[in-house]
């Protein structure tokens, strides 16, 4: 009688699909020191996930980054316009005060 083994194999595509679907967080610290004197500490925090999963957990920084998104560039233009309008308002208020 032959014994059957249920061998499941995963391809790299299957593994990547699971990782992107669920997400993976990798955290680590690297410390360089001499004689109990800490010279350098590097904190590494890495998340690997699909865009949908990242948005689901609240990570959407790339949507407003002016270097990565047209929305971000629009926000930069709005900030500049807002700053200019504040300066203009301040100038007008000062002119009104001097006329009193």
UniProtKB/Swiss-Prot annotation:
Localization, per the record, is: Gas vesicle
Q: What S-S linkages are listed for this chain?
A: none
Q: Which domain of life is it from?
A: Bacteria
InterPro entries named in the record? Gas-vesicle_GvpA-like, GvpA, GvpA-like_CS
Record's GO cellular component, any one?
A: vesicle membrane
Indicate the principal place this protein occupies in or around the cell.
other
Q: A Gene Ontology MF term for this entry?
A: structural molecule activity
Q: How is the protein put to use in biotechnology?
A: The minimal pNL29 gvp locus overexpressed in E.coli can be filled with Xe and used as a contrast agent for ultrasound and magnetic resonance imaging. Engineered gas vesicles (GV) can be used for noninvasive imaging in E.coli and mice. Heterologous GVs with 2 copies of gvpA plus gvpC from D.flosaquae and the gvpR-gvpU operon from this bacterium make GVs suitable for imaging of bacteria deep in mouse tissues (e.g. the gastrointestinal tract), or when expressed in tumor-homing bacteria, can be detected in tumors.
Q: Which UniProt keywords apply?
A: Gas vesicle
Q: Family per UniProt?
A: Belongs to the gas vesicle GvpA family.
Q: What does this protein do?
A: A minor component of the gas vesicle, might be involved in nucleating gas vesicle formation. This protein could be important for the shape determination of the gas vesicle. Gas vesicles (GV) are hollow, gas filled proteinaceous nanostructures. During planktonic growth they allow positioning of the organism at a favorable depth for light or nutrient acquisition.
Whom does it interact with, and what assembly results? Answer: Interacts with GvpA.
Protein name, please?
Gas vesicle protein J
Tell me the organism.
Priestia megaterium
């Amino acid at each position: 009688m032959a014994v059957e083994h249920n061998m499941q194999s995963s391809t790299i595509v299957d593994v990547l699909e699971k990782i992107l679907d669920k997400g993976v967080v990798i955290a680590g610290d690297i410390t360089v020191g001499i004689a109990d004197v800490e010279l350098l500490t590097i904190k590494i925090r890495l998340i690997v996930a699909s865009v949908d999963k990242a948005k689901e957990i609240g990570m959407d920084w790339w949507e407003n980054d002016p270097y990565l998104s047209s929305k971000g560039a629009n926000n930069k233009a709005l900030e500049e316009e807002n700053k200019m309008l504040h300066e203009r308002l301040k100038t007008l208020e000062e002119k009104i005060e001097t006329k009193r």
